[in-house]
Amino acid sequence: MDAIKKKMQMLKLDKENAIDRAEQAEADKKQAEDRCKQLEEEQQALQKKLKGTEDEVEKYSESVKEAQEKLEQAEKKATDAEADVASLNRRIQLVEEELDRAQERLATALQKLEEAEKAADESERGMKVIENRAMKDEEKMELQEMQLKEAKHIAEDSDRKYEEVARKLVILEGELERSEERAEVAESKCGDLEEELKIVTNNLKSLEAQADKYSTKEDKYEEEIKLLEEKLKEAETRAEFAERSVAKLEKTIDDLEDEVYAQKMKYKAISEELDNALNDITSL
């Protein structure tokens, strides 16, 4: 952008130089008019003083005529130079307007890109929170599985104890009363284990429901992240388009600089011709 602004300043400086040269051309034109008037006065004086020298008077008349023709040519060239300056002013104005529009589009694209990056960062933080929660849920599930395995082991041990009691009931009828008490204790433990098993089963079902819920949320966040990625790609595309527009503007300004240089050379040639014409008039 700094390079573009410098180029625009150079164009404005060239425009001011062209205006100064046009004003100088006007001054040269006025000087030529004064010189022409002076020649006319000298011609009149010579006509009064040298009535007999018609050849010299005719020579001075031709010189005045040539001076008038050169003056007309100088006026035409000065007019053309002024028209070129006006055209250059219009082109510079168009380039400045186009540059302003490109800067606005680029600023908008950069703002949208920044917003998309912020949204992506927020989504990433949300995903990390979900992952942490999922890890905690997995740890809870592992703990519940361990509790379930422990409950199964306890149940198996209870079954083995119950079978052992039954065998002892067959073998030891004399200890029937004691065996019945042990059986009641075992049955009570089995009931407690069954209740614990039911609780563990319910906890597992609750964990499965929570896992399904988190899975649904994860799918939703994935869709949101995908949408944000699409928006980010769109913002990047717009930014690339803005950069291409700026490059195009830079090329346009380079072309204008070439054209300004050509106009300067043209104006220089005009100035040289005008100087030559004034020198010719002065030499007369």
Swiss-Prot record:
PTM sites of type Phosphoserine: S61, S87, S158, S206, S215, S271, S283
UniProt modified residues of type Phosphotyrosine: Y261
Region (Disordered): 1-65, 117-136
UniProt keyword Coiled coil, yes or no: yes
Tissue-by-tissue expression: Present in primary breast cancer tissue, absent from normal breast tissue.
Annotated effect of mutating R133P: In CMYO23; likely pathogenic
GO molecular function: actin binding; actin filament binding; identical protein binding; protein heterodimerization activity; protein homodimerization activity; structural constituent of muscle
N-acetylmethionine PTM sites in chain numbering: M1
Post-translation changes: Phosphorylated on Ser-61 by PIK3CG. Phosphorylation on Ser-61 is required for ADRB2 internalization.
Result for mutant: Q103R: In DA2B4; uncertain significance
Entry keywords, A to Z: Acetylation, Actin-binding, Coiled coil, Cytoplasm, Cytoskeleton, Disease variant, Muscle protein, Nemaline myopathy, Phosphoprotein
GO CC list: actin cytoskeleton; actin filament; cytosol; muscle thin filament tropomyosin
GO annotation terms (biological process): actin filament organization; muscle contraction; regulation of ATP-dependent activity
Keyword Methyltransferase: no
Subcellular location: Cytoplasm, Cytoskeleton
Biased composition (Basic and acidic residues): 12-40, 51-65
Pfam families: Tropomyosin
Main location (coarse class): cytoplasm
Oligomeric and partner information: Homodimer. Heterodimer of an alpha (TPM1, TPM3 or TPM4) and a beta (TPM2) chain.
Similarity remark: Belongs to the tropomyosin family.
Role summary: Binds to actin filaments in muscle and non-muscle cells. Plays a central role, in association with the troponin complex, in the calcium dependent regulation of vertebrate striated muscle contraction. Smooth muscle contraction is regulated by interaction with caldesmon. In non-muscle cells is implicated in stabilizing cytoskeleton actin filaments. The non-muscle isoform may have a role in agonist-mediated receptor internalization.
UniProt comment concerning the protein's domains: The molecule is in a coiled coil structure that is formed by 2 polypeptide chains. The sequence exhibits a prominent seven-residues periodicity.
Record's disease association: Congenital myopathy 23: An autosomal dominant muscular disorder characterized clinically by hypotonia and muscle weakness, and a static or slowly progressive clinical course. Disease onset ranges from birth to childhood. Histologic examination of muscle fibers shows various anomalies including fiber type disproportion, an irregular myofibrillar network, abnormal thread-like or rod-shaped structures, and cap-like structures which are well demarcated and peripherally located under the sarcolemma with abnormal accumulation of sarcomeric proteins.
Listed name of the protein: Tropomyosin beta chain
Organism of origin: Homo sapiens
Highest classification ranks of the organism: Eukaryota, Metazoa, Chordata, Craniata, Vertebrata
